[in-house]
Design a protein with these regions (language model features):
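Short glycine-aspartate micro-motif
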Residues: 121-125
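Post-signal peptide N-terminal segment of secreted/secretory-pathway proteins
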Residues: 60-61
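Helical "lid/coupling" subdomains associated with nucleotide-phosphate turnover
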Residues: 3, 23, 27-56, 68-78, ...
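Tryptophan-centered short beta-strand motifs
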Residues: 11-14, 141-144
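Active-site-adjacent helix-turn-beta-strand microarchitecture at beta-sheet edges
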Residues: 127-130
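N-terminal glycine-rich anion-binding loops that anchor highly charged ligand groups
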Residues: 12-22
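N-terminal basic/disordered segments at the start of proteins
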Residues: 2-13
Length: 269
């Protein structure tokens, strides 16, 4: 949740940002439904958000749901429970609506966005259930494709395979590259990808902090990214958590997202 202040003098200013991770998608992609336990936790957190908004005297708010709610079989039940127990009405975004808002946020936030997309650029939105890859060339969107390679979906697939952690990267690469190879044949062809813009809840935050070897926060070259991957491969969860200031619980999902990004780098080379 983000709290903003609007005023004629300073325009829009972010004054608070509160985050609580609940992996609703684990239930959606494993069983097709969000469990009562997850709904209870979600409602509890949303009630706390409502209390925070009251403290700030918030006059209006918007709450959105994406693939974890959109793809569950009990969407209407979940939305009704949230409304009754928290007073919050969730607006469930379609895939295209979600991507449109993501692109707007990138364009508004990145001062160099227009300059970047003059060259071959892929915007990759990594969600829980799928990823959206959009190709820009000479300042124009030339192709966009949704692939069912979301982080939580891949995690559930690894769980079903009952694979050892040492085998995760190899299995992920096989799964990811089988779909990306089709995408490459259909859309890349002779195009060159010079830049990849990542939108996710996992690796992006680390890039903003500045990865090993990166000279500028928010940017990383392929060589520095390979160094980051080597750290992820060779260090324990505790060591990685201490190095990057993250929780150990988030590392499995960060690793899956990191392998996805590495595969995208490889097909663009």
């Amino acid at each position: 949740m983000k709290i903003f202040e609007f005023s004629p003098k300073i325009g829009i200013r972010e004054i608070d940002h509160i985050r609580h991770r609940i992996d609703l998608g684990n239930d959606t992609f494993a069983t097709g439904k969000i469990s009562y336990e997850k709904v209870d936790e979600l409602c509890r957190v949303l009630r706390e958000f409502v209390d925070i908004m009251r403290g700030y005297k918030v006059e209006d708010f918007k709450a959105y749901g994406t693939s974890a709610i959109r793809e569950t079989e009990n969407t209407m039940i979940v939305l009704d429970q949230i409304r009754q127990r928290t007073g919050i009405r969730i607006e469930v975004l379609s895939n295209s609506e979600q991507r449109f808002l993501d692109y707007k946020s990138i364009a508004l936030k990145g001062q160099d966005f227009n300059k970047i997309i003059e060259k071959g650029t892929a915007i990759v939105d990594i969600g829980g259930g799928s990823i959206q890859v959009s190709l820009f060339d000479k300042d124009t969107l030339v192709a966009t494709q949704n692939l069912r390679l979301g982080v939580l979906r891949l995690q559930e697939l690894l769980n079903k395979l009952n694979a050892k952690p040492s085998k995760y990267e190899g299995l992920l690469e096989e799964i990811i590259e089988s779909q990306l190879s089709v995408f490459k044949r259909m859309y890349l062809k002779d195009r060159t990808i010079d830049n990849i813009i990542i939108v996710d809840d996992y690796v992006s935050a680390l890039i903003q902090k500045r990865l090993t070897g990166s000279q500028t926060p928010g940017y990383v070259d392929s060589a520095s990214y390979e160094m980051f991957m080597q750290i992820m491969r060779t260090h324990t969860k505790e060591e990685i958590a201490a190095r990057f200031g993250i929780s150990t619980e988030s590392i499995p999902l960060i690793f899956i997202s990191a392998v996805l990004i590495l595969s995208l780098i490889h097909i663009s080379e």
